A protein has these predicted regions:
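Conserved SGNH/GDSL esterase-like catalytic core that processes O-acyl groups on lipids
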Residues: 1-63, 70, 147-148, 190-199
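Hydrophobic/aromatic beta-strand patches that form the interior of the parallel beta-sheet core
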Residues: 6, 78, 116-118
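Structural beta-sheet core signal
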Residues: 40, 79-80
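Histidine- and/or cysteine-centered catalytic micro-motif in compact active-site loops
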Residues: 43-44, 82-84
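Generic structural signal for well-ordered alpha-helices
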Residues: 61-66, 103, 107
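A short helix->loop->beta-strand "cap" motif at the edges of active sites that frequently abuts
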Residues: 72-76
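Catalytic His-Asp segment of secreted/periplasmic serine-dependent ester chemistry enzymes
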Residues: 84-200
Length: 200
């Protein structure tokens, strides 16, 4: 009972190397540990590539997700987007120009791979959020304007949990609506038998 977490964390990892996992080995892990969810949270290390075109990353990460689905059949995949990151432009800290294009690419490959998606950039406040997280007291992020500190990590986790829980509550409501039997309409003199709605 409870939650068991395996954390595959490598400094400087873009997420692409996990596409080389050995399928047989991963399935052996899965048969013993029976994973329910894989969370992919990458991005900060891709922002420094000097490009605003992330079509290449979108395509390659879509292949990574497909590979993970082979490694761990039936396991749900959640993609958490890159958080905000600030860079100095003309002596002023601003959201890095690459954050939104990368975020959009991550959302697209999540949709294409039928994975769940949480937009961390939006959840933490969108444009300029990292500046606020660094400069407010007590600070929630480090002076590199990239990484959360322990307070920010806790808040980020809370934001993701809240988003997932709200989605789950919405799912339960929609399930209830779908389970309700459709009321049959009795025909009477008012209803025209052959029109766009009731055509037989």
């Amino acid at each position: 009972k409870g939650v068991h977490v395996d954390n595959f964390s490598n400094r400087g990892n873009s997420g692409l190397p996990i596409g080389s996992f050995n399928i047989a080995t991963m399935r052996a892990f899965h048969s013993k540990l029976d994973y329910d969810l894989i969370v992919l949270h990458y991005g900060a290390n891709v922002l420094n590539y000097g490009s605003l075109n992330y079509g290449w990353y979108e395509k390659r990460m879509a292949k990574v997700v497909a590979h993970l689905k082979e490694c761990f059949p039936g396991v749900a995949i959640l993609i958490v987007s890159t958080a905000d990151k600030s860079t100095k432009y003309d002596l002023e800290m601003k959201t890095d120009f690459a954050v939104v294009p990368l975020n959009n690419a991550q959302k697209r490959y999540a949709i294409k791979s039928k994975s769940s998606f949480v937009n961390m950039y939006t959840l933490m406040g969108g444009s300029g959020a990292m500046i606020r997280w660094v400069e407010q007291e007590p600070a929630r992020a480090n002076k590199d304007y990239t990484h959360f500190n322990h307070r920010g990590a806790k808040e980020g986790a809370t934001l993701v949990f809240t988003q997932l829980n709200q989605g789950y509550e919405m799912y339960k409501k929609l399930r209830k609506i779908q389970k309700k039997p459709v009321a049959r309409i009795k025909k009477d003199s008012i209803i025209i038998n052959k029109d766009s709605v009731y055509e037989e």
